C-alpha cells in the first residue's frame, strides 16, 4: 500500500484539532463510573462541572482545555506499507503547524533556552513523533496526543534496586500521586513503566498513560499490579482537582520491559482528566478517524 503524503499531512492537522475538542468515549464512560461511585459531595460537584465542560466544548465546537499541550504523534506502520520515513515525518510536522496556524490554536511550544515561541507548535524535535511497526499488512495508524503541562510536569523516574521488590514499585507510584496532588488536574490516568533501561522505562510510562481506559497490561503480573495500584491510589483521598474524594484516578496502567539483573527502574507519567487523543487509520479503502 502506497501512502499519500498529502493525506497524511491533512490527517496530522485534523487529528490535532479533533483531539483538543472531542474526548474519547472510554473517557466519558470513565467519568460516568466515577460520578456514580463518588461519595464526597464536593468531589461529585467537581466531577459534574468537568462532565458539563466536556459536553459544552463538544456542542460549541470548542477546546476542552486551553492548554494545547505538546503535540505527540505515535505512528504504527504495517509491513506492506510503502512510505519513506523522513517524508512521513515531514508531512506530520507540516500538518501539526497547519492546525496551529489555520484553526488557529495557541502554540504552547517554545525553545527550551530562549523560550521563543514561533507560534507553529513545532520546534527542535517537536512535534514528538514515535514510530512502531505492525504485522497488519496494509495499514498505517497515526495517533495524536496533545500532552498538557499539568500532567507532564509531574513525571518521575526511579532506578529502584531488585532487592526492594514490588513493594518499592507500589510505594513509589503512590508517593508520586501524593506529591502531584491537584497539579495534574485529577482524576488522572496514571501511567507506570517498569523495567528496561531508563529511557525505555519513561517511554513505557507515557504509552501506558495514553492507553484507552478499560485496556489491560498484556502480562498477567502487570495486570495484577494495575488493579492493586488503582485501588491504592483511589484510597488516598486526593480527589478531583485535589479537593478530596474517592475519584483520584480513572485507572493505573502498567507497561513492562525485561531489564538488567541489577536494575529495576520504575517511571510514572500521568494523563489529566481531559485524557485527549485522536487517531487516523489508513488502509486501501481510505482514511478512518477514531480515538
Task: Label each residue range with its predicted role.
Residues 1-192, 197-291:
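Non-transmembrane, aqueous-exposed alpha-helical and coiled segments at domain scale
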Amino acid at each position: 500500500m502506497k501512502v499519500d503524503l498529502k493525506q497524511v499531512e491533512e490527517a496530522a492537522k485534523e487529528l490535532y484539532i479533533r483531539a483538543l475538542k472531542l474526548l474519547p468515549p472510554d473517557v466519558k464512560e470513565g467519568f460516568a463510573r466515577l460520578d456514580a461511585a463518588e461519595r464526597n459531595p464536593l468531589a461529585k460537584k467537581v466531577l459534574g462541572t468537568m462532565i458539563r465542560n466536556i459536553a459544552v466544548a463538544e456542542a460549541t465546537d470548542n477546546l476542552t482545555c486551553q492548554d494545547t499541550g505538546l503535540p505527540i504523534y505515535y505512528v504504527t506502520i504495517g509491513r506492506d506499507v510503502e512510505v519513506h520515513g523522513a517524508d512521513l515525518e515531514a508531512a506530520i510536522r507540516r500538518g501539526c503547524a497547519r492546525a496551529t496556524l489555520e484553526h488557529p490554536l495557541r502554540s504552547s511550544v517554545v525553545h527550551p533556552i530562549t523560550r521563543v515561541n514561533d507560534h507553529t507548535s513545532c520546534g527542535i524535535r517537536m512535534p514528538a513523533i514515535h514510530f512502531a511497526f505492525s504485522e497488519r499488512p496494509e495499514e498505517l495508524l497515526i495517533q495524536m496526543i496533545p500532552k498538557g503541562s499539568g500532567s507532564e510536569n509531574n513525571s518521575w523516574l526511579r532506578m529502584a534496586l531488585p532487592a526492594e521488590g514490588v513493594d518499592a514499585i507500589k510505594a513509589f507510584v503512590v508517593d508520586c500521586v501524593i506529591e502531584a496532588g491537584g497539579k495534574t488536574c485529577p482524576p488522572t490516568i496514571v501511567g507506570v513503566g517498569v523495567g528496561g533501561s531508563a529511557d525505555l522505562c519513561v517511554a513505557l510510562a507515557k504509552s501506558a498513560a495514553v492507553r484507552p481506559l478499560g485496556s489491560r497490561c498484556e502480562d498477567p503480573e502487570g495486570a495484577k499490579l494495575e488493579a492493586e495500584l488503582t485501588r491504592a491510589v483511589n484510597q488516598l483521598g486526593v480527589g478531583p482537582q485535589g479537593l478530596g474524594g474517592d475519584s483520584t484516578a480513572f485507572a493505573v496502567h502498567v507497561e513492562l520491559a525485561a531489564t538488567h539483573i541489577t536494575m529495576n527502574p520504575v517511571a510514572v507519567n500521568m494523563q489529566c482528566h481531559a485524557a485527549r487523543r485522536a487517531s487516523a487509520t489508513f488502509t486501501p479503502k481510505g482514511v478512518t478517524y477514531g480515538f
